[in-house]
């Protein structure tokens, strides 16, 4: 009987998701300056824009690249580099250009050739997360279903993977007992990599000190302060010795690598009422960071007074698995997760007065809800070269590259204002 009820609930949920998607699709011309939807061969659990951009002469687009991965059923997995053509400002976006056979938005021009897989490198199991090293973006670290963290220099691998399926990382980083997701390169110390694991620990490696012969590198330091699965870890963006970690013990911990105590953080705070899944330091303000949680909220923190939560962002209907500050705007951050939504928030709007109708759509700081995904969003990334462009990937193989309409974030233009869910006012 329970099975029948579950099947009925699933069918109802699927119908609701499809209806919501139809409404979203109909409203895309009002909501977005760009939408590209691409069905990947396999779902990617990870997404990160590479920092380079190519602007070909005489063309109305620029070429950007993404680090992706695969999560296959039982087939060979790959670390993937893809290229994406983004239109220049003067190229016209035509939201009506929807290819129903491919299930893709062209976004602009014709559909073909906008998103291409450039490099595939054999990987051991699915790619839980992949992140490039800021000082040398050819070097990419990955989290695997085993306990090892792998490091690849993609310039040393052929663009087509070896058919044998053999995974040949340039380095293999040892120290964890279990898999995990959190991964962070130090932006100020080349080669310093942090990793968070289900084994309750955080490992630190320094790959710049590796002898040329050795492929296996042991962790330089293992931090053991958390009492449950460590979900995410992140270096501070300005202080080379500071990093933060969050875990299923509901805590946010701030660590200093100069301290000799690897089992006790500098600060520990009960951050949420459920597991804490992600954190992000603000790139413009050295004291501000955000955490996202299974309690469906994003919390805002000030390192100078962690006893006091600055703000709680509330609109998500389920667990939050990713939070990222905008690289271009100090007050903008985005969050995503199980509810299939990516929310963009604006701190500067906290506390603004709202009409009762507006309040129904969400708090004033909720700038935009991206409703284009019909499955859990696994990861997303702000484009470092094109403001307001985001790539998001979901569990149903879909990758979307999108940019909200300028009138939503530019307050000067009050004409044709659009509420965040896309029902135009």
Curated annotation (Swiss-Prot):
Main localization, broad class: nucleus
PROSITE patterns linked: WD_REPEATS_1, WD_REPEATS_2, WD_REPEATS_REGION
Keyword Nucleotide-binding among UniProt keywords: no
UniProt GO MF annotations: histone binding
Ranges of the WD repeats in the UniProt entry: 32-125, 126-175, 176-223, 225-270, 271-314, 315-371, 372-404
Gene Ontology CC annotations of this record: CAF-1 complex; chromosome, telomeric region; ESC/E(Z) complex; nucleus; NuRD complex
List of residues that carry N-acetylalanine: 2
Keywords in alphabetical order: Acetylation, Cell cycle, Chromatin regulator, Chromosome, DNA replication, Nucleus, Repeat, Repressor, Telomere, Transcription, Transcription regulation, WD repeat
Compartments (UniProt record): Nucleus; Chromosome, Telomere
Biological processes per GO annotation: chromatin remodeling; DNA replication; DNA replication-dependent chromatin assembly; regulation of DNA-templated transcription
Source taxon at top rank: Eukaryota
InterPro entries the record matches: G-protein_beta_WD-40_rep, Histone-bd_RBBP4-like_N, WD40/YVTN_repeat-like_dom_sf, WD40_repeat_CS, WD40_repeat_dom_sf, WD40_rpt, WD_repeat_RBAP46/RBAP48/MSI1
Sequence similarity: Belongs to the WD repeat RBAP46/RBAP48/MSI1 family.
Quaternary structure and partners: Binds directly to histone H4, probably via helix 1 of the histone fold, a region that is not accessible when histone H4 is in chromatin. Probably forms a large corepressor complex that contains ncor1, sin3a, hdac1-A and/or hdac1-B, hdac2, rbbp4-A and/or rbbp4-B and possibly rbbp7.
Role played: Core histone-binding subunit that may target chromatin assembly factors, chromatin remodeling factors and histone deacetylases to their histone substrates in a manner that is regulated by nucleosomal DNA. Component of several complexes which regulate chromatin metabolism.
Protein name: Histone-binding protein RBBP4-B
Organism encoding this protein: Xenopus laevis
